[in-house]
Amino acid sequence: MSFGYIGIQFGFALQNSNLSRIFETLGAKQDAIPALWIAAPVSGLIIQPIIGYMSDRTWNRLGRRKPYFLLGAILASLALLVMPNSPTVWVAAGMLWMLDASINITMQPMRAFVGDMLSDEQKTKGFAVQTFFIGAASVVGSLLPYILTNCLNISNTASPGLIPPSVKWAFYVGGLIYISAVLWTIFSTKEYSPEEQEAFNVHETDAAAKEGDELSLDPAKYYASGMVLLIAGLIFTFLVKHYTWDRALYILSFGIAIYGMFQLAAAKLFITGIKGGLVEIIYDLNNMPKTMRQLAWVTLFTWFAMFAWFIYCTSAITSYHFGTSDPLSKEYNDGADWVGVMNSVYNGVAALVAFALPVAARKTSRVTTHVICLFIGGLGMMSLNIFKDPHLLLISMAGLGIAWAGLLTMPYAILSSVVPHKKMGVYMGMFNLFVVIPQILAAATMGLMLNKWFDGHSINMMVLGGVSMLIAGVLMMFVKDGGREAQ
C-alpha cells in the first residue's frame, strides 16, 4: 500500500535537488528563490485539507482514496515532463505550482490510506514502511542527474539559460516512475468499505470519535475571531506596503486576512443551516485534538529547518565548499551534483533508520524516539558550517537522515491514533497546515534573514535551521501520545 510513495518521492527528490539549480540557471537571484519556492507550501495549504475532506466522503468502484491517487499521478507526471523544458523562470514557477498541487492530491490520501488500513498497534510500522520507500526512492531520485552524468556520460552543463541534459533526462525518468509506482498501489491493494471501517473502529468511544455527528458552533465567537483576523491581516498588508518591506511578507498578511474571511463565512453558513464543507473544515481546525495541537508546534519548527535546507542547500554548498556561485562554472555544477549525492545520503539513512524506529518506540516511546531523532538532526545541520571537506558533509547528512526518518514516521503514527477514523483524511490534511505554514514563513522571511543577518552567506541558514530543529526537539518532550501504542 506504500509502494506509490516511490513515485511521489521521485517527484519531491528531483524538485528538492534541482529546482533551485533550474531557477538560478534561468536567471533567478538567490534572494528571490524563496518566493519562487512558495508554490509547494501554498499548494499543500489549500489542497490537502480539501482533498482530505473529499476523500473521507468518497466511495466508488476505485475506492475511497484511490481516485485521488490516480488523478494526482497523471498530473504530476505531466508536470515532470514539462518543467525541465521551461524557457523562463516564470514558466518554471508555473510548472512547480502544477507539480506540487498534483503531488499533494496523491500524497494526502496515501497517508490517510495507512491510517484507514492498519490498527493502532501496526501504525508505527506502517508509517515506517512509508518512510523506507520515501528514503529509498529519494536516494535514486536525488542521484539521477549524477548517475546520468557519471555513468551514462550525459552532460551536466549547458549554454547560458538552458537546463543541462542530465537534469532534463532525470525529470523524464521521474515522470515515468511516478505514474508506474502509483498505478501499482492502485491495482495491488483493496480498500476496506465504509461498513468494514465502522466494524474495525467500534472501540472509539471518546468525544472526538463522535465529533461532527452533530456539529455545533457559536457564530458570535466565529464572527469576533474572524473580524480580528481580517483586520489584523489588512493592517499587516498596509504596513508591508507603507514601509516597503519585502513583498514576500504579503503571503503572511493575505493569509491572515483570508483565514479571517473563512471564519466569517463559516459563521454565516452555519446560521443559514449549512454544516458541511467549509463550515466543518473550519470547525474541525478550531477543535483539533490536544495532541495534534502539541505536534503542530513541533512540526512548525522542524519544517522551518527542512525548508532552509531545501531552499539553500545548493547555494550554501556550492559557495562555501566549492568556492563559486556562478551557475555556468564547472565547479558550481559539480557542487550542485554533490548536493544531489548529499540528498541521497540523508534519504538513504532515513530508509535504513525506518526499520529501527518501531523497535525504538517499543523500547522507549514514540515521543522519546522522535526527540532523539530531532536532536541528532539539528546537530547535523549545524555541522555543515564546521566541515570544510565536502566528503565530511556526508556525516552531517547522516544526522539529518535520522531526523528525516523520525519526521516522516512518528508524528503521523501518533496523530492517526488520536483522531476519529471518519475524519482521518481531513485531519491528515489539516496536519499538513503545520508543515506548510513554516514553509510560507520561511519563504517570506529567509530572503530577509540571508541579507540582513548573514550578509548573503547562505551557509549560515543551515545553522539557523539546525537551531530550529533543536527547538522542535525540546517541544516534542511535552507531547502527550494518547494512542494505544503510546508506551
Please report, for each region that a protein language model flagged, where it lies by residue.
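Hydrophobic core of transmembrane alpha-helices in multi-pass small-molecule transporters
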Residues: 79-83, 87-106, 392-406
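Intracellular juxtamembrane helix-capping segments at the cytosolic ends
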Residues: 105-118, 406-420
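Intracellular loop-helix junctions on the cytosolic face of multi-pass helical membrane proteins
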Residues: 87-90, 106, 120-307, 475-487
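Loop-to-transmembrane helix entry/capping segments in MFS-fold secondary transporters
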Residues: 30-31, 120-130, 336, 419-431
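Helix-to-loop junctions at the C-terminal end of transmembrane segments
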Residues: 46-62, 352-366, 450
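C-terminal ends and interior cores of transmembrane alpha-helices
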Residues: 69-88, 376-388
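C-terminal transmembrane helical hairpin of 12-TM major facilitator-type secondary transporters
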Residues: 361, 367-410
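Helix-loop boundary and gating motifs at the non-cytosolic
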Residues: 1-43, 236-237, 294-298, 302-327
